[in-house]
């Protein structure tokens, strides 16, 4: 082992070593081993002896921290304790092929409190089987209970030694606690895990050992594409199966190795292409949906297959041969699936291929160097034989949908992220550039199945992936591991109807009406696997009104599942279309790669498809996200509410749009308003934090609802519910704590009540909740008037008090029916309130808006002269996000509270950041109101602005102790150019002095 180490680490010595005698070689080996060991100071010999290649260990000082036994110090999803004389304590944890469920954690824990620093964990693991040239498991270290992975490594069976324990090192930098170490078993080979030993390391460049690829970055080319259409060879958006056989063969795949599961899913696609006959149990809910098929009469009987592998011989006549994939090049699993669909083959691992006795249609081992090369070959050689109207972005190890992919010959691709892009065959930028080229050659408005994310930094990611698809006029129908689509899609339900609605409550002038909108029903696994099936069983359901989001595509792919929800709904359950229509997309980016006016045509066709399938599912409200442009929100209302199918079928048009994935807007007066055809727009007023406890989530939701409630009554609110983090019992507690002033209603009732109130307003005036200005500095702000009169109106505005040197632009305007007109008011602040008068013949309204003047004496630096500051927003520090710090009372603060970071209590870092609110491109000034609370010197903080998410940083300023006198608030100005999109403002605390943050005021600079 040592000799191999020497030759690998110092390749130029290999030739010289070849002529030495065995004795000479041994002496050199011992000498070199001593050298290596000396460089890893503090690492025990028993650990070093079991590292396959110790020369790759970093040079530095090793300090023992802890040792955890696999069988007693960790939790397990699979496996069992076994005796092993070679293991520490004569016991180990074992997982075996054919006995344990693949793709599950064999080990996770121990959630140990460990100080921040650089570490290497050594996993002691033994291979039990002969290597099959496949991945065995993935090791990682993480914090926040798996939400933040510090480093991971994918281990193939060829990296192990059969019958002998070896030490596998994993380096990471720990910044939080408790620490979790995990072993995720792939199910391809049997292994035993003895223990995990942790060492702290010093004098080591640990970041060099954490392998990360760059986040894939699209080039933006090609662009200005022409509209590209190909007629669909099938009548609906998705290809459908034939009706299922009256008798289904039911087989349980869960006990089988992962490669057998993969093979049988491809077989299911071939067999069910002719007529659905095979139904697999793979997910925990597959029995539930099978029972429903029988209860509704779509399937008359079932026959249990004792061993699913027998199906291969039963249906041998359907199979022309096998495609052997290369387990060490992930893309070959996707290419093999495509070849199976085209060639009527099954996909086989090298291990299975040895014993199957099937003709080899294609052997993909060692065919390509990278994943990108494999996908490019597939497009050039297979695209003409594949379906051009559905594609899939599928992680190669997500196998549950392979039946549908094979059945309908679907093109499959994957774009790696920073983690999987650093592994064998990964090249994220090459992969994304290839897909840009391929997307441009595909028809518009086609669905992308599966999902572009497979874990933290695995895959291009949800946001970047959906953005890329949207730019090319494609939408995502999330469907990771949705099984048996080759069965479900054969069930035909021409139209679904929600149960008759109860009457809405009486509109009361002093109430706040709100609807719980439960997220992610666009994602088919949420409907079929989790969390909706579990939430649906809650005893709270039926006692409170809930809005359940659901994909309009579901009626084609999982009609029986939708039928289950509709049939078992209570009068308090209501369904609305999920983001952002027929599929998940970001309307702000939709069709961006196409030339004008083709971009508008592409988007309008997407809306037409959405309207068609909303009609078929009796959906009258729609949840949308990734949309900040008012004209696009209005386009939804114009197109869908007047769409011929929706109008003729339902009589009443689209009633409401529920906008955003969590709270995005910051002004309570901006979250609810009407748009075209009096369609109500309800922006989300609540968000979430993954790290919150159950109680913190309840409190956060209650506080956000109250903070985002306008002062006027009645009020109407969209309460966004992150389905991954809430259950119905928590929402019941939220309703209880809000009290009787707040009335929960169904989403359709919220829309109807709002329309009733809107009709009473006749002319609806919308202003900001407050205006913030700097003393003696011209300020401008916007307001709008919506015409709900039912006839055209001419409206005039004038400022009564609160400003001097006033201009209103325009002073008068004609407003068409169901149209909104924007007005701009400019002036120098003079009071604490701005009074504005609106007149339209007999209708006269006066609006009062609070005005807060910021003192010139608090400015840490003078503002540029000759500017008008258009007030954009005010972000109270307590309502932004924080990595550290705490809330404190302060009578001189804006809201009587500040966010404080104190030495010895808070952690160095961003104590305030957010809010990711959307703003148009332009020049801005942010005023950070800060106060130093203690002695200090040097740089005590940095303030900056950036596009939401931290990149790019648009401006930053370092703040010294001298700039902030102790005990006095100062307004620190930061000027920046914003490219458009979500704005993030941040305060980074250095720990050099105690610091309080009151708010951040944001202004757009105008001449």
What are these regions (language model features)?
Residues 483-566:
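Active-site beta->alpha N-cap acidic-glycine motif
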Residues 213-489:
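Preference for solvent-exposed, low-hydrophobicity sequence contexts
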Residues 42-77, 85, 205-212, 858-888:
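Extracellular carbohydrate-recognition regions
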């Amino acid at each position: 082992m040592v000799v191999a180490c020497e030759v690998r680490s110092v390749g130029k010595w290999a030739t010289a070593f070849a002529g030495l005698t065995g004795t000479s070689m041994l002496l050199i080996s011992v000498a070199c081993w001593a050298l290596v060991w000396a460089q890893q100071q503090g690492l025990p010999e028993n650990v070093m002896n079991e590292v396959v290649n110790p020369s790759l260990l970093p040079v530095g000082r090793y300090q023992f921290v802890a040792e955890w036994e696999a069988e007693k110090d960790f939790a397990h999803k699979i496996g069992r304790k076994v005796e092993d004389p070679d293991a520490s304590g004569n016991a180990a944890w074992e997982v075996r092929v054919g006995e344990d469920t693949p793709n599950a954690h064999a080990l996770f824990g121990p959630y140990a409190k460990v100080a921040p620093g650089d570490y290497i964990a050594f996993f002691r693991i033994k291979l039990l089987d002969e290597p099959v040239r496949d991945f065995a498991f993935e090791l990682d270290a993480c914090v926040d209970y798996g939400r933040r992975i510090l480093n991971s490594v994918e281990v193939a069976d060829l990296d192990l030694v059969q019958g002998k324990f070896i030490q596998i090192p994993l380096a990471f930098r720990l910044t939080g606690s408790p620490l979790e170490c995990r072993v995720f078993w792939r199910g391809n080979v049997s292994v035993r895990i003895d223990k995990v030993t942790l060492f702290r390391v010093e004098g080591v460049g640990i970041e060099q050992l954490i392998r990360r690829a760059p986040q894939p970055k699209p080039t933006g080319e090609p662009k200005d594409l022409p509209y590209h259409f190909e007629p669909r060879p099938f009548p609906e958006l998705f290809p459908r199966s034939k009706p299922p056989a009256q008798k289904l063969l039911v087989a349980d795949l869960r006990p089988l190795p992962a490669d057998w599961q993969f093979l049988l899913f491809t077989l299911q696609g071939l067999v069910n292409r002719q007529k659905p006959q095979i139904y697999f149990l793979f997910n925990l809910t597959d029995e539930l949906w099978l029972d429903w098929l029988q209860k509704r009469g779509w399937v008359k009987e079932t026959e249990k297959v004792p061993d699913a592998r027998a199906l291969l011989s039963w249906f041998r006549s359907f199979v022309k041969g096998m495609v052997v994939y290369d387990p060490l090049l992930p893309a070959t699993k996707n290419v093999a699936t495509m070849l199976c669909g085209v060639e009527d083959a099954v996909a086989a691992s090298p291990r299975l291929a040895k014993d199957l006795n099937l003709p080899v249609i294609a052997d993909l081992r060692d065919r390509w160097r990278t994943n990108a090369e494999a996908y490019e070959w597939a497009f050039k050689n297979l695209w003409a034989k594949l379906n051009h109207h559905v594609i899939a972005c599928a992680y190669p190890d997500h196998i549950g949908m392979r039946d549908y992919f094979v059945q309908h010959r679907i093109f499959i691709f994957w774009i790696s992220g920073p983690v999987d892009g650093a592994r064998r065959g990964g090249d994220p930028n090459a992969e994304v550039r290839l897909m840009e080229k391929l997307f441009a050659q595909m028809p518009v408005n086609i669905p992308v199945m599966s999902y572009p994310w497979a874990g933290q930094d695995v895959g291009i990611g949800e946001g970047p992936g959906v953005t890329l698809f949207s730019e090319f006029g494609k939408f995502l129908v999330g469907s990771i591991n949705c099984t048996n689509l080759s069965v479900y899609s054969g069930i035909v339900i021409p139209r679904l109807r929600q149960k008759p609605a109860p009457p809405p409550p009486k509109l009361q002038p002093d109430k706040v009406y709100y609807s719980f909108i439960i997220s992610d029903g666009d994602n088919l696994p949420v409907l079929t696997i989790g969390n909706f099936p579990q939430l649906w069983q809650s005893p709270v359901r039926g006692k409170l009104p809930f809005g359940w989001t659901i994909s309009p595509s579901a009626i084609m792919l999982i009609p029986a599942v939708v039928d289950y929800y509709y049939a078992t709904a209570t009068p308090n359950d209501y369904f609305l279309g999920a983001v952002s229509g027929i599929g998940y997309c970001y309307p702000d980016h939709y069709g961006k790669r196409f030339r004008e006016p083709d971009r508008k045509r592409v988007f309008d066709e997407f809306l037409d498809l959405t309207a068609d399938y909303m009609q078929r599912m009796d959906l009258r409200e729609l949840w949308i996200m990734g949309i900040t442009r008012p004209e696009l929100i209005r386009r939804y209302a114009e197109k869908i509410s007047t769409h011929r199918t929706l109008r003729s079928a339902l009589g009443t048009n689209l009633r409401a749009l529920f906008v955003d994935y969590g709270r995005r807007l910051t002004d309570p007066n901006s979250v609810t308003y009407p748009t075209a055809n009096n369609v109500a727009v309800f922006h989300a007023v609540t968000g979430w934090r993954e790290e919150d406890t159950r109680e913190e989530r309840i409190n956060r939701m209650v506080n956000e609802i109250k903070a985002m409630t306008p002062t006027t009554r009645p009020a109407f609110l969209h309460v966004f519910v992150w389905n991954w983090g809430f259950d119905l019992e928590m929402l019941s507690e939220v309703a209880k704590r809000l009290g009787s002033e707040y009335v929960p209603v169904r989403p359709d009732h919220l829309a109807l009540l709002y329309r009733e109130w809107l009709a009473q307003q006749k002319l609806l005036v919308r202003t900001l909740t407050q205006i913030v200005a700097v003393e003696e500095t011209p300020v401008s702000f916007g307001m709008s008037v919506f015409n709900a009169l039912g006839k055209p109106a001419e409206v005039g505005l004038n400022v009564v008090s609160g400003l001097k040197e006033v201009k209103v632009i325009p002073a008068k305007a004609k407003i068409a029916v169901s149209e909104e007109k924007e007005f701009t008011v400019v002036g120098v602040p003079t009071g604490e309130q701005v009074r504005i008068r609106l007149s339209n013949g007999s209708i006269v309204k006066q609006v009062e808006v609070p005005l807060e003047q910021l003192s010139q004496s608090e400015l840490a630096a003078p503002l540029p002269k000759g500017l008008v500051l258009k007030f954009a927003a005010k972000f109270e520090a307590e309502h932004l996000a924080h990595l550290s710090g705490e809330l404190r009372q302060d009578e001189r603060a804006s809201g009587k509270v500040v966010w404080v970071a104190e030495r010895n209590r808070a952690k160095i870092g961003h104590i305030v950041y957010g809010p990711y609110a959307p703003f148009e491109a332009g020049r801005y000034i942010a005023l950070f109101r800060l106060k130093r609370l203690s002695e200090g010197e040097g740089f005590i903080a940095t303030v900056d602005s950036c596009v939401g998410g931290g990149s790019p940083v648009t401006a930053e300023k370092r703040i010294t102790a001298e700039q902030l006198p102790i005990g006095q608030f100062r307004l620190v100005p930061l000027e920046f150019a914003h490219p458009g999109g979500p704005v993030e403002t941040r305060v980074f605390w250095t720990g050099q002095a105690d610091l309080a943050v009151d708010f951040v005021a944001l202004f757009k600079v105008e001449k």
